[in-house]
A protein has these predicted regions:
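Bacterial Sec-dependent N-terminal signal peptides
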Residues: 3, 8-11, 15-35
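Acidic/His-rich structured neighborhood in mature extracellular/periplasmic domains
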Residues: 54-58, 67-207
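Active-site rim elements
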Residues: 74-77, 206-213, 259-263
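Sec/Tat-exported extracytoplasmic proteins
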Residues: 93-98, 173, 177-181, 225-233, ...
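Glycine- and aspartate-rich repeat motifs characteristic of hemolysin/RTX-like Ca2+-binding segments
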Residues: 301-365, 371-374, 380-391, 403, ...
Length: 413
């Protein structure tokens, strides 16, 4: 019952696809220029067909290696931060993962999607989705996958920081990639997914929709992705704006899957874990630009007292925006940490980091004594090298006015 709405939507979109195959006057999006927008999001121009403009107001895209577009259409209930997050997740999934079995070069996956005019349709809610398809959107000759604003918090917004809403963006965007990128180009991956899914069923995985077994490996991968990035270690409070009813401890997705973290997937579902590792980066590759009104400290280091850090621990590249005084704490992956025009305190927290304070009076934090570091000034940066191994690493500082050591604070030009 929990997935009846998703099942209805799947049937509706499949019906739309079948109807399009019968048409000879298919409608498509024109080329939309986003180069004039700082964040790549624009208001839909008048050149866009009316069946699109009567539902959507915003647009962005990713350009595949073949020069064609993968599209995003958004309704008015989506903030631009949310739209950027959806685009970031798509970019992450399509970023090549050198040395991996299925993700070493994802050019073919992205090209296949753009050839099929793959499009994320970002609705406010399910009612708006049904209204749009019943009102003419079915005539748009694009391969579409829905995502709703009430299931897609943006990194750093209030919902994300309080860990309120289940983030469905990874799963739903995966479905678009799977249907129009993976199926046409990765037959070996599809076979491996099916084997892993079948073994997981024997262990208790309850796939949905129950009467569509051909879709079970696709849904299974969506569940694996969520757990690989630890989105369910702390269960969300809301699921599509409805109170979430938890399943048994250690499970996710209303108890339908028997593991709730990357570590548990590795031990309880090794075949599924192996498939994920063959395509997905172990960390999130996109630059997360925090909301302009963000205040406080955003941490990329796991802190079990802060539920959001189970998600943020896989980020490596974060940018503060706006002018509020705010702080960043990195992790041990080697980060790109960028401040805003306010006063920022930035701690790399391990690994070799690129730290840019931006405007304002900014400080970089190191946990050791000042005489345990070597400081080298370059023309456009200051290099701080920790002489103790496995601690602060080697950080490159730019637009940083102060360095905070455990024993003193020094000023740098």
């Amino acid at each position: 019952m929990k997935y009846s709405i998703s099942t209805l939507i799947t049937v509706l979109i499949l019906f739309v696809a079948c109807q399009k195959n019968l048409r000879s006057d298919n409608i498509t999006l024109p080329d939309i220029d986003i180069s004039g927008s700082a964040n790549g999001i624009v208001t839909l121009p008048q050149t866009v067909p009316s069946i699109v403009r009567k539902t959507f107001v915003k647009y962005t895209k990713l350009i595949a290696p073949n020069g064609k577009s993968i599209h995003f259409l958004a309704q008015d209930g989506w903030t631009e931060d949310q739209i950027m997050h959806a685009r970031n997740v798509m970019q992450h999934i399509l970023t090549s993962y050198p040395g991996s079995t299925y993700g070493n070069d994802k050019t073919g996956v992205a090209n296949s999607m753009s050839d099929k005019r793959a499009t994320m349709v970002l609705f406010n809610d399910t009612d708006e989705l049904e209204k749009a398809f019943n009102g003419g959107l079915a005539d748009l000759d694009h391969s579409m996958q829905d995502l709703r604003s009430n299931e897609s918090p943006a990194v750093g917004d209030e919902d994300y920081m309080a860990h309120v809403t289940r983030d469905a963006s990874y799963e739903e965007i995966w479905h678009l990639v799977h249907d129009y990128g993976i199926i046409p180009t990765r037959p070996d991956m599809i076979r491996e997914m099916r084997v892993a899914n079948d073994v997981a069923v024997e262990k208790g995985w309850r796939a949905w929709p129950q009467d569509e077994p051909q879709e079970h490996p696709n849904e299974y991968m969506g569940v694996l992705i969520d757990n690989y990035y630890d989105l369910w270690v702390i269960e969300p409070k809301l699921y599509e704006a409805q109170d979430y009813e938890p399943g048994p401890d250690g499970t996710t997705h209303f108890g339908s899957y028997f593991a709730n973290s990357r570590a548990h997937v590795e031990t309880k579902d090794p075949l599924g874990y192996t498939v994920i590792e063959k395509f997905f980066h172990p960390y999130l590759t996109f630059n997360a630009q925090l909301p302009t009104d963000f205040k406080g400290t955003f941490s990329l280091s796991l802190d079990k007292s802060q539920a959001y850090t189970y998600k943020s621990q896989y980020l490596i590249d974060v940018t503060l925006r706006g002018s509020n005084n705010a702080n960043l704490r990195g992790n041990r992956l080697g980060n790109n940490l960028t401040g805003n025009s306010g006063n920022n305190i930035i701690h790399g927290a391990g690994g070799d980091d690129e730290i840019d304070g931006g405007g304002g009076d900014d400080g970089a934090v190191f946990i050791g004594l000042s005489d345990e570091y070597e400081i080298t000034k370059q023309e456009d940066a200051t290099i701080v090298s920790d002489v103790q191994s496995d601690r602060d690493g080697i950080d490159r500082l730019s637009n940083i006015e102060f360095i905070h050591f455990s024993d003193k604070k020094i000023e740098i030009n």
